[in-house]
């Protein structure tokens, strides 16, 4: 399975979690493939609207380019949504973290499983 297919699968998984919890969500067409599509999902519920960048990792950490995060934040601001990263670590489930809480070790931003446990939230905490 290609990285593109894996990414689409985790996006669909998260989309379904939103639907199962009475939120409305849409996957952004061309996410990760085209310019100006700097997020993967848009989700909302009365008075709450989020722009979501979806990441997954088999390893206990994930690196994300600074350019991608900067574009994601700008995109979120332009359309008036709160930016949040959704990171799924295999066998650990989903963590939701604000972009400003990412670690900045240099070239890329990073989030480790340990940091996600400390700084991130689970679905019910992030979207209550």
Q: Model regions: which residues?
A:
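Acidic-basic catalytic patches of nuclease active cores, encompassing PD-(D/E)XK
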Residues: 1-30
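Domain-level recognition of nuclease-like catalytic cores that cleave nucleotide substrates
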Residues: 5, 9, 82-128
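Residues at secondary-structure transition points
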Residues: 5, 9, 36, 63-66
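Acidic-residue sensor for enzyme active/binding pockets
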Residues: 11, 53, 68
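Amphipathic alpha-helical interface surfaces
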Residues: 14, 37, 68-71
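Conserved catalytic cores of phosphodiester-cleaving nucleases, focusing on short active-site segments
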Residues: 18, 41-58
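Active-site metal-binding core of divalent-cation-utilizing nuclease and nuclease-like domains
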Residues: 21-46
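Short, charged, amphipathic alpha-helix that recurs within catalytic cores of restriction-modification
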Residues: 49, 57-88
């Amino acid at each position: 399975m290609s990285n593109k297919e894996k990414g689409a699968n985790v996006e669909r998984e998260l989309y379904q979690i939103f639907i199962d919890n009475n939120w409305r969500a849409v996957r952004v067409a061309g996410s990760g493939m085209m310019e100006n599509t700097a997020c993967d999902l848009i989700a909302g519920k009365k008075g709450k609207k989020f722009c979501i960048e979806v990441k997954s990792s088999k390893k206990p950490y994930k690196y994300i380019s600074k350019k991608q995060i900067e574009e994601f934040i700008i995109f979120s601001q332009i359309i008036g949504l709160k930016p949040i990263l959704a990171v799924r670590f295999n066998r650990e489930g989903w963590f939701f973290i604000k972009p400003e809480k990412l670690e900045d070790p240099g070239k890329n931003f990073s989030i480790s499983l340990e940091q996600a446990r400390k700084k991130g939230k689970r679905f019910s905490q992030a979207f209550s």
